[in-house]
Amino acid sequence: MATTAQYLPRGPGGGAGGTGPLMHPDAAAAAAAAAAAERLHAGAAYREVQKLMHHEWLGAGAGHPVGLAHPQWLPTGGGGGGDWAGGPHLEHGKAGGGGTGRADDGGGGGGFHARLVHQGAAHAGAAWAQGSTAHHLGPAMSPSPGASGGHQPQPLGLYAQAAYPGGGGGGLAGMLAAGGGGAGPGLHHALHEDGHEAQLEPSPPPHLGAHGHAHGHAHAGGLHAAAAHLHPGAGGGGSSVGEHSDEDAPSSDDLEQFAKQFKQRRIKLGFTQADVGLALGTLYGNVFSQTTICRFEALQLSFKNMCKLKPLLNKWLEETDSSSGSPTNLDKIAAQGRKRKKRTSIEVGVKGALESHFLKCPKPSAHEITGLADSLQLEKEVVRVWFCNRRQKEKRMTPAAGAGHPPMDDVYAPGELGPGGGGASPPSAPPPPPPAALHHHHHHTLPGSVQ
């Protein structure tokens, strides 16, 4: 409180509590301009006092941002001959007054209005740079509330000095040391970081772009290098596999030439396509049909299947050529290929004798088949197969002949059939059905006639 009483405005009578005349707002603006002009030429001692006053102002401030509006009341320093009576020093001395005064108070509110005057006087020297600085820095440069003890100073004054040198050392450090020393290290650090951000803010996009571009090139180069590192191995492996498969797999011309030679050799040796397929199944376990061999010779199989079948056919040809000198081996191979016997043609007279024997006995015994084969000079197996085929033929013909009898039963009632209607039925045939069955039959034919 002693400090507050020391810097209270003095009236014309020289007392600390005296009430002097109030100054008009226009005169207050002129006084503020004069104070700013003197502040720009102040010495080191004044700067020390300014530090003290600014520090006290920040410590005892109400924490409300104030602008540069014209104050309603401006106390004057026209009295007493103290050290701080009058002049720009008095204005800054008044700034350390009590910060709890109201704007409409004459004495107690002088501290608040003195802060307004101090705000205008302290930053009037940088008023020429406030507009452009605010345009460049923007509201994002305002310090945080905790940077200077909870007080939020105006961003246009201190921040203008951060970008544009003022009268007090120049630059950010000079202005902080001269006019903003009481702001504390927190605000200094915030301003320092904000200044760097303001300087680097336009440059990050190109920097990031260049870095991203270079990093993208490096990353792409790394990927290409990795791909190039992996690709030769994979490519080499694939090429080696491809070369290996190309060496093993024949070309289309080789397959065409082999198919032509195989067909000529097969015909010359007397084997059919079915014989070759069966022989392959007997020799190598892979049974091929006659259609497959035919398609191989006609080059109608797929390239993969042609490549698979060619080695087997080539082995079969080699086996056949090696056994061509010995008829026994050749007959053995031919017998292996010809598992199905040839079709036997029977003469008309022999066929008639077999037919007459079939009418007598459709299913002869083994002894009868042997005697019949000897009498007809046929093989026993031929006679047996003929009787089997004849019985199958009879079965196929009998259902067609018996298919006409059921309609006869539907047309004629059982009672209307005469004694000879049964044909081969014996005399002890069952009697005709009772009238009830006949009535039931008529019930189905004429449902409306019988109730």
From Swiss-Prot:
InterPro entries: HD, Homeobox_CS, Homeodomain-like_sf, Lambda_DNA-bd_dom_sf, POU, POU_dom, POU_domain_TF, TF_POU_3. Residues 220-232 have a biased composition (Low complexity). Pfam families: Homeodomain (PF00046), Pou (PF00157). Residues 11-20, 76-85, 95-112 have a biased composition (Gly residues). SUPFAM superfamilies: Homeodomain-like (SSF46689), lambda repressor-like DNA-binding domains (SSF47413). Its main location: nucleus. GO terms for cellular component: chromatin; nucleoplasm; nucleus; transcription regulator complex. GO terms for molecular function: DNA-binding transcription factor activity; DNA-binding transcription factor activity, RNA polymerase II-specific; RNA polymerase II cis-regulatory region sequence-specific DNA binding; sequence-specific DNA binding; sequence-specific double-stranded DNA binding. Residues 190-199 have a biased composition (Basic and acidic residues). Residues 339-398 bind DNA. SMART domains: HOX, POU. It is found in: Nucleus. The keyword DNA-binding applies. Residues 427-436 have a biased composition (Pro residues). One of its GO terms (biological process) is axon ensheathment. Residues 1-21, 69-114, 127-154, 186-253, 395-451 are annotated as: Disordered. Expressed in embryonal stem cells and in the developing brain. Residues 247-321 form the POU-specific domain. Transcription factor that binds to the octamer motif (5'-ATTTGCAT-3'). Acts as a transcriptional activator when binding cooperatively with SOX4, SOX11, or SOX12 to gene promoters. Acts as a transcriptional repressor of myelin-specific genes. Belongs to the POU transcription factor family. Class-3 subfamily. This is POU domain, class 3, transcription factor 1. It comes from Homo sapiens. The lineage of its organism: Eukaryota, Metazoa, Chordata, Craniata, Vertebrata.
